[in-house]
């Protein structure tokens, strides 16, 4: 499965548009990680805990996106948009959503 934020794939022809596909992931943030991440942010360091959670959520969302595209018989998803949001009380959860158009291609 190929993923692209562009509307086309170089060197390939889109032969069929299969439909819009989406993938979402919502992960809760651990209160102790939040506390220590806040301290690192204050002293100017990077928050490895948050970066790891973002990466994990993005991987889950893309896996779901690919599963939906495969179910439609597609071999690629183009025009992908990635959004990040904090949700829940006091932004206690992280949501990653991805969407795009599932397509069949030919070289």
From Swiss-Prot:
What are the cysteine partners in each disulfide bond? Answer: none
The record's listing under InterPro entries reads:
UPF0145_dom_sf, UPF0145_YbjQ-like
What PANTHER family does UniProt report for this protein, alphabetically? UPF0145 PROTEIN YBJQ
Which HAMAP family does the record match to this protein?
Answer: UPF0145
Q: Which family is annotated?
A: Belongs to the UPF0145 family.
Kindly provide the name given to this protein in its UniProt entry: UPF0145 protein YbjQ
What species is this protein from? Escherichia coli (strain SMS-3-5 / SECEC)
Highest lineage ranks of the organism? Bacteria, Pseudomonadati, Pseudomonadota, Gammaproteobacteria, Enterobacterales
């Amino acid at each position: 499965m190929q993923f692209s934020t562009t509307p086309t794939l170089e060197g390939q022809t889109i032969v069929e548009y299969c439909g819009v596909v989406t993938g979402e992931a919502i992960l809760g943030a651990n209160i102790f990680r939040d506390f220590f991440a806040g301290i690192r942010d204050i002293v100017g360091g990077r928050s490895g805990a948050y970066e790891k959670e973002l990466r994990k959520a993005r991987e889950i969302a893309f896996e779901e996106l690919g599963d939906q595209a495969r179910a439609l018989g597609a071999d690629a998803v183009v025009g992908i948009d990635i959004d990040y949001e904090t949700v829940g009380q006091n932004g206690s959860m992280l949501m990653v959503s991805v969407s795009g158009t599932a397509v069949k291609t030919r070289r």
